[in-house]
A protein has these predicted regions:
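Short aromatic-centered micro-motifs
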Residues: 50, 79, 184, 390, ...
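Short, small/polar-rich motifs associated with maturation and membrane association
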Residues: 2-365, 373-374, 419-421, 448-449, ...
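Extracytoplasmic gating/loop element in the C-terminal half of outer-membrane beta-barrel translocons
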Residues: 284, 295, 428, 432, ...
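Low-complexity intrinsically disordered tracts that form flexible linkers/tails across taxa
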Residues: 369-390, 789-795
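Conserved C-terminal beta-signal and adjacent last beta-strands/turns
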Residues: 7, 14-15, 310, 774, ...
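Acidic carboxylate motifs that coordinate Ca2+ or other divalent cations, activating on Asp/Glu
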Residues: 847
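Exposed, low-structure sequence patches enriched in small/polar residues
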Residues: 580, 586-590, 774, 778, ...
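Extracellular/periplasmic, surface-exposed regions of secreted and cell-surface proteins
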Residues: 134, 181, 274-275, 282, ...
Length: 894
């Protein structure tokens, strides 16, 4: 017993001793780890998180970047901070830790014309952004992602129709009749900007969820490499791709939106309308008994959905990505909707130890739209009699489908004896009937593909050979079904089809040599390109006298003879094509990473001009000085970038010119213009107007800018000033009768100038371990003025489209000393309270009467100032963002 007890006590004593030893040993292994965390420039990182991997202890770096934490001697520490790559280190004494910054953009590679460049090596006015860096929001088009995000880029969204396109202007307009749209380059393929019937948005082919980045080239030193297509700037869009060795990743995002009318127009209700007429002494016996809010009858709350799914990854040497998207967008005006399907494929295999790199992209888009007559529906909702009902239970209104309409006696062409009335014209129309009595459906298919091959010469890796071929095909078919009860085509209706298709093929090849000789860094590129564009249009439409057809068919080959139809419209078919041949080159020189020089040249030959005028030549040059790399600023570590930029360049313009306008063409007449020979009528060949003296529009741009970034990307701004002048402006002007085959002609007639200032500002006011506040702001001011103009007998020329309401005439002109597309109006007279007196205008020429000589230029549609503000809050894995944009000084006519 005694031995047993002693044995147990011995075990207990040994166990206790071992426990005390292990505890003391464990206590002895823990140390206090101290360290100092800096960024790539040596500046302390404040608020970085330091954690023991697998443990619960942690610390945060102080204002000097220092930290202290208790950890086992061989423990692993993980240091993380928003905007930096995570880093793991083994615990030790006096650690010196440097984090790699992933948020700073100075060394980001930016896509430019026919190549790439580091952002801090750019010499021209170039802005690159990523959708993830911006306020995400809900977007249905790539153009929505640019609204208010870039200084000097004005994005005016469409009129509310689902899927409607946007008008994008970079530094204002520079042309009268030619295009003011920028050039779009998507994954290396230049996109044909000419929209077809049924297509409203040239960027609709891209799913916004597929976009990796935008690069906007503004000044001529950056855009001249694109020559005649780049007078209005260039927007380069790069889509997302997989990464080599990446595991397959499936991503889904979707959104649901509810759209409503922000604010209805204030109009009189039925009681107020009756009272107003009575006070004016107008007989109200013809008014109805209803109280209809016509705006409520045409507007609705519209629910829309958007779904996107993608899979991306990378085999050993072949990154891939496939994306699918579907958008179901309903408009706030009843009957309007849009459905869009997108798919994209990106493959980027590499071979021969990454010396041979291939990039293949393909995109397909199908869009189906139902268009509503927005303008007429809304306009008539504001003017329609509120005392009338939407529908009337009276046989007299059967001729308009039972809707209330103002009626008139039927015309002589109405053969149906049961059709007693017709819709009256030149009066307000029932807006609900306008929407329901017409059905316009458009189907659009768009497919594009681009194959790029880049070969880095073995044994001479500084030389790259690059070749690419791409194509785009678009087919658009719009069916117009306006039934016989409509007010616009009462009795006959209208049934027609507009079918258009276009395709473009682009091939290019260039060589690029880059090498560094000590402090001299050079990059030389030269190449050639050829593009071909084709367009075909086919239209057919007809109204039908159904009673005449049914009672007197006069069949021809078993079908109704449309020639006997009083509303017959002949078939029309039109096709055309043009080509562009180009040679281009670029030279970049960098001395000591301080002084940068870029020179580019491009020669374009166009089939739209005659021999002797086919070629346009577009040089450009730019200089940049990296002031922060000078010796006197080397020790100023808080400045990341301070760069001065100066640039000059020339670009051209040929869009807006009909193909082969330099030579007479002949068109076949329709059935209404035939020539009789005996008892037979024959269609004729008619010559069209032409101008063999047309030449390129030419735009010369001067640009100066300053880029500044500090505090490791926490603060920065860019400021640019520019002057741009366009000469040999293309515009259609009146000509003397008999001098050509028409009464007007497209000519080179003048010059216009734009100048302005742009400022972009970004800051991170708060940056902590888990929270970041990011703010960006941009503002741009632009002045636009016509300096030369050949006008003929008047000192102005008409422009724009006719206004459908009111005087049904043109209301915009171009005139020397005025902005483009100025409104040409009468000067309103106001009462003592500042309210306009209806129908009373100023007799500006003092001749005692109000006539067209009293009209004057007043305001224009282009804004003087555009600005955008984006603020974003990031807390751990959550973010909240808001975006605002404004345009100031632009006017509309209504």
């Amino acid at each position: 017993m005694m031995k047993q007890v002693k044995f147990q006590n011995a075990i207990r004593t040994a166990t206790l001793s071992a426990g005390l030893f292990l505890s003391a040993s464990a206590f002895a292994q823990q140390i206090t780890v101290k360290g100092h965390v800096v960024d790539e420039t040596g500046e302390p990182v404040i608020g970085a998180s330091v954690k023991v991997v697998g443990g619960k202890t942690g610390a945060v770096t102080d204002i000097d970047g220092n930290f202290s934490i208790a950890a086992d001697k061989k423990a692993t520490l993980e240091i993380t901070y928003i905007g930096y790559e995570p880093l793991k280190v083994v615990a030790g004494q006096d650690l010196k830790i440097q984090l790699k910054n992933t948020s700073t953009t100075l060394n980001d590679v930016v896509v430019i014309g026919y190549g790439r460049a580091k952002k801090n090596d750019l010499t021209g006015s170039v802005t690159a952004i990523k959708p993830d860096d911006m306020s995400k929001g809900i977007t249905s088009s790539a153009s929505d992602m640019l609204v208010g995000k870039i200084a000097g880029v004005d994005v005016q969204t469409g009129g509310g129709q689902p899927g409607s396109g946007a008008q994008i202007r970079i530094r204002g307009g520079a042309s009268l009749n030619a295009s003011n749209d920028p050039l779009y380059v998507i994954d290396g393929l230049a996109i044909d900007n000419n929209n077809l019937t049924g297509t409203s948005n040239v960027l609709a082919m891209i799913n916004p969820s597929d976009i990796e980045s935008f690069t906007v080239l503004k000044d001529a030193s950056a855009t001249a490499i694109y020559g005649s297509r780049a007078s209005n700037g260039v927007i380069i869009i790069t889509t997302k791709k997989g990464r080599a060795g990446q595991r397959p990743t499936v991503t889904y995002n979707g959104d649901v939106t509810l759209s409503t009318v922000q604010k209805k127009y204030k109009v009189m209700n039925a009681g107020e309308y009756k009272q107003a007429l009575t006070s004016l002494g107008i007989d109200t016996s013809g008014l109805g008994t209803a109280d209809t809010d016509w705006q409520d009858e045409i507007f609705r709350k519209a629910l829309s959905t958007n779904h996107n799914i993608s899979i991306q990854g990378g085999l050993k040497d072949m990154p891939y990505r496939v994306g699918l998207g579907f958008e179901d967008n309903n408009g706030i005006v009843k009957t309007s909707w849009m459905k869009r399907y997108n798919t994209s494929v990106n493959l980027a295999p590499s071979f021969l130890n990454k010396h041979l790199n291939i990039n293949f992209t393909a995109k397909y888009m199908f869009e189906k739209d139902r268009y509503a007559n927005y303008g007429d529906a809304i306009g008539n909702a504001l003017t329609m009699d509120p005392t009338q009902p939407v529908r009337v239970n009276d046989e007299m209104y059967n001729c308009v489908g039972g809707y209330f309409q103002y009626l008139d006696n039927k015309g002589d062409k109405i053969s149906d004896p049961n059709w007693t009335k017709m819709a009256k014209s030149q009066v307000p129309q029932n807006p609900v009937a306008l929407l329901n009595n017409q059905k316009i459906i458009a189907n659009t298919h768009d497919i594009s593909s681009n194959l790029e091959v880049d070969y880095k010469i073995h044994g001479f890796e500084d030389l790259h050979l690059h070749a690419a071929i791409g194509a785009q095909y678009t087919d658009a078919k719009q069916h117009n079904d306006i039934n016989k009860y409509s007010s616009s085509n009462n009795y006959f209706g209208w049934y027609g089809t507009d079918h258009q298709y276009k395709y473009s093929i682009e091939g290019k090849a260039f060589a690029e040599y880059a090498h560094k000789f000590g402090v001299h860094d050079i990059d030389i590129m030269a190449g050639a390109e050829q593009s071909h564009y084709h367009r075909t249009t086919y239209n057919f439409g007809s109204g039908i006298d159904e009673y005449l057809r049914d009672t007197n068919p006069e069949l021809v080959d078993g079908e109704w003879n449309y020639v006997n139809n009083p509303q017959y419209k002949a078939n029309t078919m039109w096709m055309s094509h043009n080509s562009l041949v180009s040679y281009f080159g670029r030279f970049n020189y960098n001395l000591m990473d301080r002084y940068l020089l870029t020179a580019t040249f491009r020669a374009d030959g166009s089939s739209r001009f005659r021999d002797g005028k086919k070629w346009g030549y577009f040089p450009a040059a730019a200089f940049a000085w990296k002031i922060n790399n000078e010796s006197f600023l080397k020790d100023v570590k808080w400045i990341d970038e301070l760069k001065l930029r100066l640039g000059w360049g020339m670009t051209g313009q040929q869009n807006g010119i009909d193909d082969f306008y330099y030579t007479p063409k002949y068109t076949i007449s329709d059935t209404y213009a035939q020539y009789p020979f005996g008892n037979t009528y024959y269609q004729t060949m008619r010559p069209t107007k032409y101008n063999p003296d047309l030449t390129w529009e030419k735009t010369t741009t001067y640009n100066g800018g300053l880029d500044f970034t500090a505090l490791n990307g926490r603060f920065g701004f860019n400021i640019d000033g520019y002057y741009r002048k366009t000469t040999d402006l293309l515009a259609t002007v009146s000509i003397a009768g008999g001098t050509n085959f028409g009464d007007n002609l497209l000519k080179n007639i003048g010059a216009v100038e734009n100048y302005g200032v742009e400022l972009a500002f970004n800051a991170k006011p708060i940056v902590t371990k888990d929270f970041v506040w990011d703010v960006t702001y941009n503002v741009g001011w632009n002045h636009n003025e016509i300096t030369e103009l050949e006008t003929g007998s008047q000192d102005w020329v008409w422009t724009g489209s006719k206004v459908s309401r009111g005087n049904n005439t043109l209301v915009q002109v171009n005139k020397v000393g005025e902005p483009l597309n100025s409104f040409y109006v009468f000067q309103q007279v106001y009462d003592e309270n500042g309210k306009p007196i209806e129908g009373l205008f100023v007799d500006r020429d003092g001749n005692g009467k109000i006539d067209n000589d009293d009209r004057y230029c007043y305001k224009n549609p282009a804004p003087d100032v555009i600005m955008g503000l984006t603020t974003k809050f990031i807390y751990k894995n959550w973010d909240f963002s808001a975006a605002f944009h404004a345009s100031i000084g632009n006017y509309v006519y209504y």
